[in-house]
Amino acid sequence: MAFETFSVALDKDKTLIFETGKIARQASGAVLVKMNETWVFSSACAASLSEAVGFLPFRVDYQEKFSSAGRTSGGFLKREGRPSEREILVSRLIDRSLRPSFPNRLMQDIQVLSYVWSYDGKTLPDPLAICGASAALAISEVPQNCIIAGVRVGLVGGKWVINPTRDELSASKLDLVMAGTASAVLMIEGHCDFLTEEQVLEAIAFGQTYIAKICDAIEAWQKAIGKQKNFSAVLDMPEDVQNVVSDFIREKFEKALSFRDKEALEQASKELEESVIANLVQEENSDFSLLNVKAAFKTAKSNQMRALIQDLGIRVDGRTTTEIRPISIETPLLPRTHGSCLFTRGETQSMAVCTLGGENMAQRFEDLNGDGAARFYLQYFFPPFSVGEVGRIGSPGRREIGHGKLAEKALSHVLPETSRFPYIIRLESNITESNGSSSMASVCGGCLALMDAGVPIKAPVAGIAMGLILDRDQAIILSDISGIEDHLGDMDFKVAGTAKGITAFQMDIKIEGITHKIMEQALAQAKQGRSHILNLMTQVLASPKGTVSKYAPRIETMQINTSKIATVIGPGGKQIRQIIERSGAQVDINDDGVINIAASTQESINKAKELIEGLTGEVEVGKVYNGRVTSIATFGVFVEVLPGKEGLCHISELSKQKVDNISDFVKEGDKLAVKLLSINEKGQLKLSHKATLED
């Protein structure tokens, strides 16, 4: 393919440039996207499956090369390897944006790889990666139903900003990443400072205009240079197979839907599927293959569940479309933790635990912008027993990382300022039961665990997951969706916030986009559900506890002049190590001169403060100090009046009477009250014990 390029101007100094035909020419699709000096490369390749499967094997891997910012990793291994949390989150963004664009029953193994090759420290690469991956797929042989594009939207100084720079985003009240087609939204994810539903909708509408512009340009490029799409890899569903399977299960599945609990429904559904396979799969007839029959069974189940909701307004567990499952809350739960809560909503349960600590407990990370440390972080755990299964235990999967980060963002906006609450805060959400909306249960349980731990949050936060049944030109929004509604429905729209406004949201859909009107309805219904949950939460715990747990460390801060930081640290860290050893406290010094002191007892904190004040304090002429004799000479004694500051008390200044032998008067290590008489031009201190006797 010859070198081809096009560009899309979004705003001043924000022009997307797409290039292909120069790099990675053997890939099915390869595109380099540039904006200023941030360049992101994306490739798309597909392989035929040796055996048909009942799902789409689609994999996205996004990687930020340290070399793109002129850096290498600070770790021992300098080669990029295991993806960072941020790389996993961006990979998920790309995956969730692109997945709805593929035809149903596409039997290809598809891989999209995205690399940040150049990063200018200003232009953020994730929306470029979404657009680049979409463009690479668009010009490849991989079949798609639609072209997609992605953008980021910020709210800076009351104005919407498209693809905000890093500096703009730091000042923004909104961080929204969204993807869609030229006419509809496919994916949104973001967090914000208590924006209203109307403001979020306005932001989405603003971003959609730019998405449409990019989609139109990619589509024109596809028509001009794109490869022929391989739609032969898309399996058709024979109409008679779907009809036979639907007729076979109609009455049986209607009976299964009468079961109101997850376990009974799943068991009945499993037995029914086994019966369908045993009775309808025909080895001699490829139309009635195992793959086709299983796919038809899933479609028939979905259609029957939808019909129940559309015709009767009743869901599989007997609820109405706006009804929220029963909620129970127990806090505190665990006796020795700093804060805990057991939050149960229907058959979804989160045991949330809050742990408070000093600076050494901060979550360290490294990315293209350098090293950093998170003051607050939430870790989500999803063990296999939560769904009654046997599975692997180990490092977290992409789903766990994504769910944890969403809940973390939802709660981060209500945390107090560090100056008011200097603790590092770790939240963990242990999912002990799951039947849908576990990430939103993590928000609710996590909020209550924070309050139980005495974290003075600005307001309680609750979360709810909304679903959608879209058929016959009728859109039905479901509040607090269960697992089967997530699996068989058209949308999973999670919204978290306070009574005042929204703090985080995430939407994934399985159809080719939804309209502004549907999102408006979903957000309005989510607000009602959120208010209901917040009311139940505040009935149990109306406000944060006034003090932290007796088992939590005590933390105090003090401010020193930045010129004294080196004095406190000492050569090779000698002084600060001595402070830690002598006080038993953990001491952390920030570049701005703020010192955090953490210890299990107040005595340790006081001792550390005393030692630091001694190092940083200035001696005053005329002031009396209770010093320590550090050495003895024939002409006098040297006395340390403050840590690191000592002076000479001449033999004539030791007593009103004549002192013949200093060793008979004082010993090394003795405490000796001395008065500072003067400081000479060399900074040497002249001390007198005799003057204290006169006083």
From Swiss-Prot:
Its cofactor is Mg(2+). SUPFAM superfamilies: Eukaryotic type KH-domain (KH-domain type I), Nucleic acid-binding proteins, Polynucleotide phosphorylase/guanosine pentaphosphate synthase (PNPase/GPSI), domain 3, Ribonuclease PH domain 2-like, Ribosomal protein S5 domain 2-like. It catalyses: RNA(n+1) + phosphate = RNA(n) + a ribonucleoside 5'-diphosphate. Residues 622-690 form the S1 motif domain. Its EC number is 2.7.7.8. It is found in: Cytoplasm. Involved in mRNA degradation. Catalyzes the phosphorolysis of single-stranded polyribonucleotides processively in the 3'- to 5'-direction. This is Polyribonucleotide nucleotidyltransferase. It comes from Chlamydia trachomatis serovar L2 (strain ATCC VR-902B / DSM 19102 / 434/Bu). The gene is pnp.
